[in-house]
């Protein structure tokens, strides 16, 4: 089993992969930055119907389930009153926050006064449920605040992280900061309990780390970035505990060695993805080469030994995660939808750190074949697990008792525009081929990007770039790793270009040029060894 190999190897890791805080340069990396989806309007034969269903079906389903079919909103109402029972699972608060994040993203591209009113009503309930010291978690408020912060597996920081993501999103969408202020009070409460010279804490389900980076970027408060870094550094030192409620499994919780010494993936798949996202975010802002080296090793292990052809990860139902390398059964595959979304999130971050298109290749695979499999074309039925083989008894469901995947999709789909374009000091990057119009500003230059394509059904892409003044940036078009031959032209004239890390690099272009990329979409087989 993989975990036993990890245990046996841990002594050697101290010598073979030794890195320390000295690897931190304390200067942000010169990295690629995504073009936010708020600047991108999608008009695409493949994606537009799905985004329309998100508005008309997915969000209404989530709202109905949260308000009427389950007790999720009622938990906040009861917590505000300080009476009543807690309904559902101890981490159900997170589904409400994720759905609210999805509502915020929807409001950016589809303003809706009624939806905004609904979101404001929810936020009022969150604020009312917050304790005087800033703590907010309906499970412990209703079952006993004396037990809070005693079991690292009870998802307190996980729920807080999703609240922070929702608070940041809603503030960016509407300018309203009521929820953001709730998040700040909760974070300050956590920092009063944990940190250097205080109590140790290893979040049983990662999420808070990447959320704290978003809070830092929104508030520019360095302490939140430092807290994210401290939480990452807590792992692998024997601090994990479930109190008197069970035995802590360091492999399952990614707590077997310090994160800098990680060499291969183990444990719960979604937790791994969120951990790696947090590491990537902190690495970028602190220029931590130790974190980057660890993620290089982990990515190689995930993609070459533990990933399905669909881009799905996590084969085991027992731990919702990983067992041995190459243990990838079809019929019994787990491949949780949330894990595929996590692959998208992590691989985008790796691309931003490196400028290598191999990460977008994996992102695209996980997006189209893993994450999207989790939702019906009607937008109202969902898969939690995504096996590659079925005997006809595996069907999408309206909802789940553990509803992390439906609520995950409610926030992921409307933000799909985040993954199309990126920018760096010297280039504009085109990562995904989706019909859209992008309006962005770089420095003093306004840029209009228009992309026309029938991708993924066809490999032809037409990109028109108009600028308010000359822009001295390269255009970098990703050439997918499945594409063996392609033609590239500007204004109908074929051009030859160099390739760097999987991107066709166009250096000579001017405003209103029409760049055409024609990729051969050929069928090919991908063989797996039987031994």
Locations of the language-model features?
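C-terminal motif of bacterial Sec signal peptides marking the signal peptidase cleavage site
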Residues: 15-16
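Aromatic (Trp/Tyr) and acidic
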Residues: 24-113, 117, 147-173, 206-223, ...
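Asp-box/WD-like beta-propeller blade repeats and closely related beta-sheet repeat scaffolds
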Residues: 142, 146, 154, 180, ...
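Bacterial N-terminal signal peptides
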Residues: 7-12
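Positively charged n-region of N-terminal signal peptides that target proteins for export
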Residues: 1-4
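Conserved small/polar residues in nucleotide/adenosyl-binding loops
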Residues: 524-529
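Solvent-exposed beta-strand/loop surfaces of large extracellular or lumenal domains
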Residues: 483-507, 523
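C-terminal beta-strand-rich structural cap/linker in extracellular carbohydrate-active enzymes
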Residues: 475-476, 507-520
């Amino acid at each position: 089993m993989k975990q036993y190999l990890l245990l046996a190897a841990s002594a050697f890791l101290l010598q073979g992969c030794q890195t320390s805080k000295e690897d931190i340069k304390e200067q942000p990396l010169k990295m690629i930055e995504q073009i936010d989806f708020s600047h991108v309007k999608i008009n695409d034969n493949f994606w537009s119907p799905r985004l329309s269903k998100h508005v008309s079906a997915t969000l209404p389903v989530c709202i109905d389930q949260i308000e009427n079919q389950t007790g999720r909103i009622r938990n906040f109402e009861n917590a505000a009153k300080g009476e009543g029972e807690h309904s559902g699972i101890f981490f159900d608060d997170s589904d409400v926050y994720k759905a609210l994040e999805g509502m915020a993203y929807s409001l950016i591209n589809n303003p809706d006064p009624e939806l905004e009113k609904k979101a404001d009503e929810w936020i009022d309930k969150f604020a009312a449920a917050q304790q005087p010291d800033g703590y907010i978690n309906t499970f412990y408020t209703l079952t006993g605040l004396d037990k809070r912060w005693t079991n690292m597996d009870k998802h307190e920081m996980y729920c807080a992280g999703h609240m922070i993501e929702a608070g940041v999103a809603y503030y960016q969408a509407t300018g309203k900061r009521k929820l953001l202020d709730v998040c700040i009070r909760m974070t300050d409460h956590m920092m009063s309990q944990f940190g250097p010279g205080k109590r140790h804490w290893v979040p049983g389900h990662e999420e808070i780390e990447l959320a704290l980076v978003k809070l830092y970027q929104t508030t520019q408060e360095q302490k939140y970035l430092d807290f994210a870094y401290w939480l990452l550094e807590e792992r692998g030192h024997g601090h994990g505990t479930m109190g008197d409620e069970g035995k802590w499994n360091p492999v399952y919780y990614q707590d077997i060695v310090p994160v800098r010494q990680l060499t291969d993936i183990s444990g719960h798949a979604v937790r791994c993805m969120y951990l790696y996202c947090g590491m990537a975010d902190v690495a970028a802002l602190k220029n931590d080469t130790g974190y980057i080296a660890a993620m290089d090793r982990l990515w190689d292990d995930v993609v070459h030994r533990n990933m399905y052809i669909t881009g799905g990860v996590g084969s085991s139902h027992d731990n919702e995660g990983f067992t041995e390398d190459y243990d990838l059964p079809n019929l019994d595959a787990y491949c949780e939808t949330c894990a595929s979304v996590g692959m998208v999130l992590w691989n985008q971050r790796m691309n931003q750190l490196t400028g290598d298109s191999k990460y977008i290749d994996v992102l695209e695979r996980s997006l189209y074949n893993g994450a999207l499999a989790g939702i019906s074309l009607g937008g109202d039925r969902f898969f939690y697990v995504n096996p590659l083989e079925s005997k006809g008894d595996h069907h999408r469901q309206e909802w789940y008792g553990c509803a992390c995947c439906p609520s995950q999709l409610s926030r992921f789909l409307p933000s799909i525009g985040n993954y199309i374009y990126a920018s760096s000091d010297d280039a504009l990057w085109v990562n995904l081929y989706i019909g859209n119009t992008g309006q962005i500003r770089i420095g003093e230059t306004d840029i209009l990007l228009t992309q026309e394509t029938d991708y993924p059904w066809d490999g032809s892409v037409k990109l028109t770039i108009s600028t308010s003044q000359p822009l001295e940036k390269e255009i970098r078009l990703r050439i997918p790793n499945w594409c063996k031959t392609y033609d590239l032209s500007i204004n109908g004239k074929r051009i030859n270009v160099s390739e760097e890390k999987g991107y066709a690099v166009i250096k000579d272009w001017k405003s209103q040029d029409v760049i055409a990329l024609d990729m051969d979409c050929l069928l090919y087989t991908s063989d797996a060894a039987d031994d």
